[in-house]
Amino acid sequence: MTKKKVKPNSNTIALNKRARHDYFIEDEIEAGLELQGWEVKSIRAGKANISDSYVIFKNGEAFLFGASIQPLNVASTHIVCDPTRTRKLLLNKRELASLFGKANRDGFTIVALSLYWKSAWAKVKIGLAKGKKQQDKRDDIKEREWKVTKDRIMKNAHRRS
């Protein structure tokens, strides 16, 4: 018998699949997160959710709002754990200025796309997004269905020949 191949560990902690469904993603940027100790432990245990999170600007700094990190039962008991705390994003001044300028245009917002490990650091991928209308979502679904149908037709055509 052959040995099963071991899959490499994925570095992705949490994905925001809804963001790509609800928004056109214009630009993507990687940012660091300022976390507390109990948050790092919880993220390592996979208790993070970024489905409704977005970026706000306050006093020239960027903050991740709406991300939920559930505390572990074994985490530190002398610290009050707030799962939905606003977390500071670690970005260069140039990146901050660029994002702030782009996000102030009409119809644009900045949403969290994914949370992942990069070596020992937790990083969040944020995207400059513009909201989709209902018709745009329908067009995406039609396009996806046509691609599946086309692949099926091509597969059957290759089998016959």
Swiss-Prot record:
It is found in: Cytoplasm. Transmembrane segments: none annotated. InterPro entries: SmpB (IPR023620), SsrA-bd_prot (IPR000037), SsrA-bd_prot_CS (IPR020081). GO terms for biological process: trans-translation. Keywords: Cytoplasm, RNA-binding. The keyword tRNA processing does not apply. PROSITE patterns: SSRP (PS01317). One of its GO terms (molecular function) is RNA binding. The keyword Nucleus does not apply. One of its GO terms (cellular component) is cytosol. Belongs to the SmpB family. Required for rescue of stalled ribosomes mediated by trans-translation. Binds to transfer-messenger RNA (tmRNA), required for stable association of tmRNA with ribosomes. tmRNA and SmpB together mimic tRNA shape, replacing the anticodon stem-loop with SmpB. tmRNA is encoded by the ssrA gene; the 2 termini fold to resemble tRNA(Ala) and it encodes a 'tag peptide', a short internal open reading frame. During trans-translation Ala-aminoacylated tmRNA acts like a tRNA, entering the A-site of stalled ribosomes, displacing the stalled mRNA. HAMAP family: SmpB. This is SsrA-binding protein. It comes from Haemophilus influenzae (strain PittGG).
